[in-house]
C-alpha cells in the first residue's frame, strides 16, 4: 500500500523527502558513486545457484537455509565463449526511449479541452506544483458498453489486457529503464496510460499502439484463458476482506458478473470471437484522453494522429459508464458467500 511504501522510504530518505525522493535530481555525490563502483570488483563476486539436488554442509543462523560455499574456479574462456555462441546470446539493443530533450513546454494552467476530431476530445492541463519538471501523465480511453451487458465481452476484455501485457513486457521494461511507464487497463473498454519523461513518449506510444491489435496464436490464447480461469478460482481462496469490494460491486454496479458466469464465458471463449471483439472495440468506441504535465497542444494533436492509424473513433458513441444501484428506503440487500478458507468476513 501507499502507506507501507512511505514507511519503507523512511529507512532510506530524510522524512521531508519520502514523497518526492524518486523525483529529485539534486545532491549528486560523485565521490560516493566512485566509492561504490570501486567495490564492484571480481574479487567480491558471489554467485548463487539454487536447486533441490545441491549438497550442503552449512545452515543459516536465523532461517532454514541449508547451503554450501565453494570457491569459484576461473573458467576456460575459450569453452565459455563457445557455450555463449551456441546459445545465441546477444547484447541488448540500444534503448531508443532514453530522454534527450528536457525542455519545459508552455502548458495551460487550467483544464483545456482540445477537439481533435468529431466526437473526440482530449483535455490538457499543466502541473501547478511540478511545472518545472519535464514529465507528464497521459491516458487514452477507448470506451465501449459491450462489457456492461455481456459477460463474454467482459472476459474478452480481460484476455485482451492479459495478452497485451505479456507481449509488451519488453517494451514496458525498456520504458521503465528510460524513466517512463506504460500500462493497459480494461474495464468499460480499454485505456493506455503513459507517465514519466515526455521527450520520448510519442515514440513509446507509437510502439505501444503497434501491438494494440493483439494477434495471439491458438496456444497463446489458450494459455490466457487458463490464466483467467486459474485467477477466478484463486480469488475464492483470498482473504475474505479482499473480496468485499468486488462483491459489493456485484450487488450495486452494472457490468459486474459472478465467478460462475465469468468462468462459463471463459470456457466458451474462442480465438475467432476474440479477434472479432478486438476489431469491434477498435472500430466503434468512444475515444477521449487526458494529458497532465509537460505537454502542449501540438503534443496532444500528435497523439491523435498516431492513434488514428490504429483506432477508428466513432462519431456517435458516448462514454460508457456503469449504472449504480439507487438505494431505496427500508430496502436491504443481502449477499452471503461460502468461502473455502477457514476465515470469515463481514461488510455492512
Segments from the language model and where they lie:
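Generic recognition of flexible, low-complexity loop/linker segments
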Residues: 31-37, 110-111, 125-129, 179-181, ...
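Short, conserved charged micro-motifs
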Residues: 55-59, 149-151, 201-203, 297-302
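Composition- and surface-driven signal marking solvent-exposed, interaction-prone regions
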Residues: 59-64, 153-154, 158, 175-179, ...
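A common structural junction motif
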Residues: 209-218, 307-317
Amino acid at each position: 500500500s501507499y502507506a507501507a511504501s512511505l514507511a519503507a522510504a523512511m529507512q532510506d530518505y530524510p522524512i521531508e523527502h519520502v514523497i518526492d525522493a524518486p523525483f529529485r535530481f539534486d545532491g549528486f555525490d560523485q565521490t560516493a558513486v566512485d566509492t561504490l563502483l570501486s567495490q564492484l570488483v571480481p574479487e567480491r563476486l558471489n554467485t548463487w545457484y539454487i536447486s533441490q539436488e545441491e549438497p550442503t554442509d552449512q545452515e543459516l543462523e536465523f532461517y532454514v537455509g541449508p547451503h554450501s560455499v565453494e570457491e569459484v574456479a576461473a573458467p576456460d574462456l575459450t569453452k565459455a565463449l563457445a557455450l555463449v555462441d551456441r546459445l545465441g546470446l546477444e547484447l541488448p539493443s540500444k534503448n531508443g526511449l532514453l530522454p534527450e530533450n528536457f525542455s519545459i513546454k508552455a502548458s495551460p494552467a487550467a483544464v483545456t479541452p482540445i477537439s481533435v476530431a468529431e466526437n473526440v476530445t482530449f483535455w490538457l492541463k499543466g502541473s501547478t506544483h511540478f511545472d518545472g519538471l519535464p514529465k507528464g501523465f497521459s491516458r487514452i480511453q477507448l470506451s465501449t458498453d459491450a462489457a456492461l451487458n455481456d459477460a463474454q465481452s467482459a472476459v474478452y476484455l480481460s484476455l485482451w489486457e492479459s495478452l497485451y501485457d505479456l507481449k509488451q513486457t519488453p517494451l514496458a521494461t525498456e520504458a521503465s529503464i528510460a524513466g517512463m511507464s506504460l500500462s493497459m487497463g480494461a474495464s468499460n473498454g480499454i485505456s493506455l496510460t503513459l507517465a514519466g519523461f515526455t521527450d520520448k513518449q510519442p515514440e513509446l506510444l507509437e510502439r505501444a499502439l503497434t501491438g494494440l491489435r493483439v494477434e495471439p496464436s491458438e496456444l497463446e490464447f489458450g494459455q490466457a484463458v487458463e490464466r483467467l480461469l486459474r485467477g477466478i478460482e484463486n480469488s475464492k481462496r483470498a482473504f475474505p476482506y479482499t473480496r468485499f469490494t468486488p462483491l459489493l460491486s456485484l450487488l450495486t454496479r452494472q457490468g459486474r458478473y459472478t465467478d460462475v458466469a465469468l468462468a462459463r464465458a471463459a470456457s466458451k471463449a474462442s480465438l475467432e470471437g476474440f479477434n472479432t471483439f478486438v476489431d469491434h472495440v477498435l472500430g466503434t468506441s468512444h475515444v477521449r484522453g487526458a494529458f497532465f504535465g509537460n505537454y502542449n497542444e501540438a503534443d496532444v494533436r500528435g497523439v491523435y494522429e498516431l492513434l488514428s492509424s490504429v483506432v477508428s473513433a466513432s462519431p456517435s458513441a458516448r462514454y460508457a459508464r456503469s449504472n449504480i444501484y439507487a438505494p431505496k428506503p427500508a430496502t436491504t440487500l443481502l449477499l452471503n458467500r461460502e468461502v473455502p478458507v477457514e476465515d470469515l468476513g463481514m461488510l455492512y
